[in-house]
A protein has these predicted regions:
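Acidic/histidine-rich catalytic cores of soluble enzymes
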Residues: 31-32, 67, 130-232
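Active-site-proximal loop/turn and secondary-structure-junction residues that shape catalytic pockets
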Residues: 5-7, 36-38, 70-73, 104-108, ...
Length: 232
């Protein structure tokens, strides 16, 4: 289970990521995915916080196969984003977590005046994704990215990204349900990317046609205007 699965419970401060690890063990799982960013809830450094979580997971007998954090290389200063991401790679390396998942791009940044094409985005981010993969290789960590964020979420676009990065230390975190968000058949999409998969998020979706009425609370709109809702 990912610590992100408990995200709503962290908001009031009464439930922590340490509690999430305990609950993961209680559910009978064998491992936990640590999802962390640049801030910590207790004032410790990201390195200190991650090490404490990792140690707690190990005390509970849980494996920590992957470290997840955000990233966005389609920005005005991608060099700074690469430097920031490398600090998270250092954390994963120090904790001996073998895999790190990072985002690639979240959308067109404010002030962008170029052609709004995902191909332009791929062209811009590839050098930095590749540099992150190489830096991680030197630290004994493998990097990966997920079909996530609308802009680079379809299987065809992800395939273009992996072909362009072309680095043996960079793979695909396959979210089985996220293809629904861009109106793609999940089974077909997963099959197309199977050679690149290094980690999987198991997820199922409820889907309703956008030609019908809004099904209500909990449903979101896909890129094509259909309704979807996660079930796991």
């Amino acid at each position: 289970i990912s610590t992100y699965s408990f995200e709503r419970l962290y908001q009031d401060g009464g439930f922590t990521r340490f509690d999430a690890i305990d609950k993961t063990k209680e559910y009978g799982c064998q491992g936990v995915e640590l999802v962390l960013d640049d801030k910590t809830p207790d004032g410790s450094t990201p390195m200190e916080y991650a090490k404490a979580l990792y140690a707690h997971a190990k005390e509970q007998g849980l494996e920590v196969p992957i470290y997840t954090t955000g990233a966005n290389f389609f920005v005005k200063e991608p060099e700074k984003e690469l430097e920031r991401l490398c600090r998270h790679i250092d954390i994963a390396a120090e904790c001996k977590i073998p895999l790190l998942r990072h985002d690639v791009a979240w959308g067109y940044y404010e002030g962008y005046t170029g052609i709004k094409s995902y191909k332009k985005v791929i062209e811009a981010v590839v050098p930095f994704v590749r540099q992150a993969a190489e830096y991680a290789r030197e630290r004994g960590v493998k990097t990966c990215s997920e079909n996530h964020g609308y802009l680079l979420q379809d299987s065809a676009r992800m395939l273009e990204l992996f072909a362009a990065v072309d680095h043996p230390n960079y793979g695909f975190l396959c979210d089985m349900g996220n293809f629904t968000v861009v109106d793609e058949d999940c089974a077909t999409a997963v099959s197309a990317l199977s050679d690149y998969i290094v980690h999987v998020h198991a997820k199922d979706m409820l889907v309703r046609s956008g030609m019908n009425f809004d099904p209500g609370k909990g449903y979101n709109l896909s890129r094509g205007g259909n309704y979807w809702r996660g079930t796991i």
